[in-house]
Design a protein with these regions (language model features):
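Flexible loop/turn segments at secondary-structure boundaries
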Residues: 38, 101-102, 132, 203, ...
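Generic beta-strand/beta-sheet core signal
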Residues: 125, 197, 205-206, 217, ...
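Conserved short alpha-helical segments that host acidic/polar catalytic motifs at enzyme active sites
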Residues: 2-245, 250-307, 313, 401, ...
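Phosphate/diphosphate-binding loops
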Residues: 231, 238, 246, 302-303, ...
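Short, glycine/charge-rich flexible loops or terminal/linker lids adjacent to PRPP-binding catalytic cores
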Residues: 329-374, 385, 412-422
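A conserved beta-strand->alpha-helix junction
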Residues: 153-164, 332-343, 440-458
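PRPP-dependent phosphoribosyltransferase catalytic core
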Residues: 185, 200-201, 236-242, 392-527
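Secondary-structure transition/capping motifs at alpha-helix termini
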Residues: 146-147, 173, 304-308, 326-333, ...
Length: 527
């Protein structure tokens, strides 16, 4: 198997003691396009998906003989320069942006992951989170024992590395990765949108529930797959369709093929419409911007208030604020200036960084808000850190009243499918009434959109959405014995699905290795 390069030439470093295996809410991209500069297309593709993860980025390419993975910690623009992109030759590429939601944010856990097969190499990127990683890891150990290969051998502790090991470990001489994938994918439980590749073929797969988005696009000389349609737009690909839940796409010199490894039971994540996806993306044919604007209109109908201005928490709250202003007749204004060079506070690994980031990220326009009664519209309240600091800043800037309006219901339940609220203890709405949350924030009033109002704004049938973070009804079984952030998750009321006895991707023991690769080269041969 080939080496994996990082920007500083190092191959590995030790994880901090006590760190747990992370989950991912990430962006994935893939391209098959002979004659195109696939590394640059992928660079632009994952740049368009930067909002989905800002801790690490990586690209893998194949020229038909060998696979090279180049990845490092940091933003896409920090990881890759012209020299790095020029070194990534080939006609197939996959790319990935990542953030960790529990535990280590380290180079070993950056993606794409790389692993040996019987006849070459597989590279893989993953958006989502698996709920049966312990069972899958047992299968890996049955195959390899303590001789863990690929990213697991280098110290990775992600469910992604486990899937990569399963794909590689189940191949025998002459096997097609396509056929092996059809055996492995049904074993995976949880949420996953995958892009992976061997030396000759690009693959894309989506779990049977379609929790995380994944779309297919057509290039002039090939194909592209991405987490969001906006990434297809950026690289000049024409949207073809969504990858169906339970579908595996295979793209090679023979064209595009489709196989189904599971019966589709769609439950797309509603939080994609609320916050995660770009507003210029479409999910299930629905404009995210239009859905958010309609959420704002519904919010104004459900929670009217006398005020002078409607201002958004930029930029994720802007479409809903516009909708609120349109429906209420209250003038819309930009009362807050956002520093675009500060990452999303929701997608930062520790509360300390989040708190500092809020002050760096937003600054009030005093001349706009002084003496005004404000409606401040935001997309969600998770921990409450942003809104609490924001209310304080607005009052210090002279706001007469601050009325907070939220275009999603209270987040009361942890997400086990790849979003960064892993325990109920982290959620401000858990155990508190709306009035108690209002008092905690220091706002004059607080209004959340209803569950019905939010769902209706998406125009997607309720039964095709996952609303577990709002309702506690989980569409995918959470395996007993799993944990969230090292602690058992709370029990979940009977909702027709298996109760949660605690869930999270369990930590895979990381065995860090020493060594260095001064230049990003590969052999393409199995270990």
């Amino acid at each position: 198997m080939g080496d994996v390069a990082r920007g500083d030439g190092r191959l590995s470093h030790d994880l901090l003691p006590g760190e747990k295996g992370p989950q991912d809410e990430c962006g994935v991209f893939g391209v098959w396009a002979p004659g195109e500069d696939v590394s640059r297309l992928t660079y632009f593709g994952i740049y368009a998906l930067q909002h989905r993860g800002q801790e690490s980025a990586g690209i893998a390419t194949s020229d038909g003989e060998k696979i090279l993975v180049y990845k490092d910690m940091g933003l896409v623009s920090q990881v890759f320069d012209d020299r790095a992109l020029q070194s990534l030759k080939g006609h197939i590429a996959i790319g990935h942006t990542r953030y960790s939601t529990t535990g280590s944010s380290s180079w070993e856990n950056a993606q794409p992951t790389l692993g040996p097969t019987a006849s070459g190499t597989v590279a893989l990127g993953h958006n989502g989170n698996l709920t049966n990683t312990r069972i899958l890891m047992d299968l890996v150990r049955e195959r390899f024992g303590k001789d863990l290969r690929g990213e697991l051998g280098r110290g990775s502790s992600t469910d992604t590395a486990v899937v990569t090991a399963l794909l590689g470990g189940r191949t025998a001489a002459g096997d097609r990765l396509e056929d092996v994938a059809m055996e492995v994918l049904p074993l995976l439980e949880g949420a996953f949108s995958l892009t992976f590749m061997d030396e000759h073929t690009l693959y894309a797969a989506r779990d049977a529930h379609g929790v995380r988005p994944l779309v297919l696009g057509r290039l002039e000389r090939g194909w592209a797959v991405a987490s969001e349609t906006a990434a297809l737009d950026i690289v000049g690909a024409t949207f073809v369709r969504e990858v169906e839940p339970g579908e595996l796409l295979i793209i090679d010199a023979d064209g595009l093929r489709s196989r189904h490894f599971a019966t589709p039971t769609p439950h797309g994540c509603v939080f994609e419409y609320v916050y995660l996806a770009r507003p210029d993306t479409k999910i299930a044919g629905v404009s995210v911007n239009a859905a958010r604007t309609e959420m704002g209109r519904a919010l104004a109908r459900e929670h009217p208030v006398e005020a002078d201005l409607v201002i958004p928490t930029p930029e994720s709250g802007t479409p809903a604020a516009i909708g609120y202003a349109q429906e209420s007749g209250i003038p819309f204004a930009q009362g807050l200036v956002k520093n675009s060079y500060v990452g999303r506070t929701f997608i930062q690994p520790t509360d300390t960084i989040r708190q500092l980031g809020i002050r760096l990220k937003l600054n009030p326009l005093k001349e706009v808000i002084a003496g005004k009664r404000l409606v401040v519209v935001d997309d969600s309240i998770v921990r409450g850190n942003t809104q609490r600091a924001l209310v304080r800043m607005l009052r210090e800037a002279g706001a007469a009243e601050v009325h907070v309006r939220i275009s999603s219901p209270p987040v009361k339940w942890p997400c086990f499918y790849g979003i960064d609220f892993a325990t109920r203890a982290e959620l401000i709405a858990n155990g508190l009434s709306s009035e108690e949350v209002r008092a905690s924030l220091g706002a004059d009033s607080l209004g959340y959109i209803s569950l019905d109002g939010m769902i209706e704004a998406t125009t997607v049938p309720r039964e095709r959405l996952c609303t577990a973070c709002f309702t506690g009804s989980y569409p995918i079984t959470i395996r007993d014995g799993a944990t969230v952030s090292g602690a058992d998750a709370p029990s979940v009321p009977d909702t027709g699905h298996a109760p949660v006895a605690g869930a999270d991707t369990p930590g895979v023991p990381a065995e860090a290795v020493s060594g260095a690769t001064p230049t990003p080269t590969t052999t393409g041969a199995p270990q």
